[in-house]
Amino acid sequence: MLHLFSYSDLNHSLLVFLALFFVLFYEAINGFHDTANAVSTLIYTRAMSAHVAVIMSGIFNFLGVLLGGLTVAYTIVHLLPNDLLLNATSKNALAMVFSMLLAAIIWNLSTWYFCLPASSSHSLIGAIIGIGLTNAFVTDSSLVDAFNIPKMTSVFLSLVFSPIIGLIIAGSLIFLLRYYLNNNKIFYRIHMTPLERKEKDGKKIPPFLIRMALILSSIGVSYAHGANDGQKGIGLIMLVLIGIVPSSFLVNLNTNKYEINCTKHTLNHLEKYFLEKNIKKSNIIKNKEEINNLVVRSQSYNSIKNIKNTKLLLKNISNYNDLSIKKRFQLRHYLLCISDSIDKKVNSSDICSKDKRFLIHSKKVILKTIEYAPMWIILIVALSLSIGTMIGWKRIVVTIGEKIGKKRMTYAQAMSAQITASFSIGIASYTGIPVSTTHILSSSVAGTMLIDGDGIQTKTIKNIALAWILTLPVSMLLSSFLYWIALFLI
C-alpha cells in the first residue's frame, strides 16, 4: 500500500492520497447514511438499545465487506466504458474520480441533513453515468458506445424494481403472520407495538423468541448491506488505482503460476469451442477506432483473434510481473474483449445449457486476472463502512422508525421488513447486482403498514419518493458538470 505514495512527484502522491480519502469518506457516509436500515427497527421495537444495536451493525457490516466477494464491485467498475478506463491519463483519472465522488457525497450529505433516506447506490451510479456522458461529448464518441448498455439496463431495472418487490414481499409476510398468528395464544404478542406490550405485560422489551428473531434479521440486513454497499467502495478504489497507478493494478500481479496456467488452459478450451462453432461473424466487437500502439481500444477483433493474441502474450509467462506495462494494458484489453464475446454468446438464443455453463465458468476463470482486490483495500473499506455505521445514524432512524407509518411498528412489521431486506440484498450481492438498501427497507416498512391497515404518513412517503426520483438525475448532472469543469481546468 505504501508504494502508492512513493512517487518523486509530491503532487501526484498527494492526489493519490486525496482520491483514496474521498473514497473512504464516501464509504463512511454510506455507513451512517444507511445504518438506519439495519438498526431503526431494532431501536423502535426496543429489542436492543441504540448504542449496542449500532455497534452490532458496524461489526456485521465489516464482516459483510470482508466476506461478500467482488461481484458487485466490478459491476460498478464496468458501468464505465473500457476505453475511458484504459486510456485515461493520470490527471483525467483523478478528475473522473473526484467529480464522481464529490457529486455522490454532496447529494448523500444533503439528503442525510434533511433526514431523507435516499439511496447511496443511486447517487453513485448516477454520478458514474454523468462521467460517461461528459466523456462521450468531450471525445465526440457515440453515446451508445459510451456505456455498457446491457449492464446499465440490468442495474437500472434492479434499482427501480427492488423497492417495489420489497413492498410486495414484506406486505405478503405480514399478511401471513396476521392470518396464522393473530389469535395464537403463544405468539399473539408479535402483533403488538412496544407501547402495547408495556401496557399489557408491564415490560419494555419484546418476548424472547420475538426479540431473537428481530436481532437475527437485523444482523442479516447489516451483513447484506456490507456485502453489497461495501463492494461499491472496493470497486471505487480499484477504479482510482487502475486510472492513477495502472502499472500496478491493471492485472493482479500476485497471481501465481498455477492460476496463470489455468487461464492458459481455459483460453485453449475457448479457442477450440469458438473454432468448432464457427461463430466469428457473430462475435464482432463493435468499435470504429483503429489500433494505436499507445492507446488500447476495443477494436473490431473477433473472439478467436483476441484469444490468440492473449495466448501469445502469456506464452512462457509464469508471473505477470514479467509483462511490460504496455503488455499489461493489452492483456486487460483482450480479456475484457473475450468476456464481451462470451456474454454475447451466452445471451444468444442458439446456445444449449451445457455450452452456457462452460462459457460462464470460463469467463470466471479468465477474469480472475483483472477482477480482483488486494486484501488491504477490502480491510480499509470494511473499516470505513463500520466506523461510519457507528456515527450519524440517528437522523434517518427517526424517519424510518416513526415517520413512515401513522403509529409505531409492531414486532411483526419490523421482522417482516428486515427479513425481506436481508434476503433481497443478500441475493443481489451474490448475483452481482447493486441495489439500494435504503429503498428496499423503507418500502418494506411501508408495505407492512399498508397491509396491516395502520396507514402511512403521506408527506414522508412523498419526500422519500421525491428523493428516489431525483437522486439519479441530480447526481448524474452534478458529476457531469464537475467533470466537465475539471477537464478544462487540467
Curated annotation (Swiss-Prot):
GO molecular function: phosphate transmembrane transporter activity; symporter activity
Catalyzed reactions: phosphate(in) + H(+)(in) = phosphate(out) + H(+)(out)
Assigned keywords, A-Z: Cell membrane, Membrane, Phosphate transport, Symport, Transmembrane, Transmembrane helix, Transport
Domain of life: Bacteria
Biological processes per GO annotation: phosphate ion transmembrane transport
Location of this chain's protein in the cell: Cell membrane
Signal peptide: none
Function: Low-affinity inorganic phosphate transporter.
Family of the protein in this entry: Belongs to the inorganic phosphate transporter (PiT) (TC 2.A.20) family. Pit subfamily.
Protein name (record): Low-affinity inorganic phosphate transporter
Protein source organism: Buchnera aphidicola subsp. Acyrthosiphon pisum (strain APS)
Gene giving rise to this polypeptide: pit
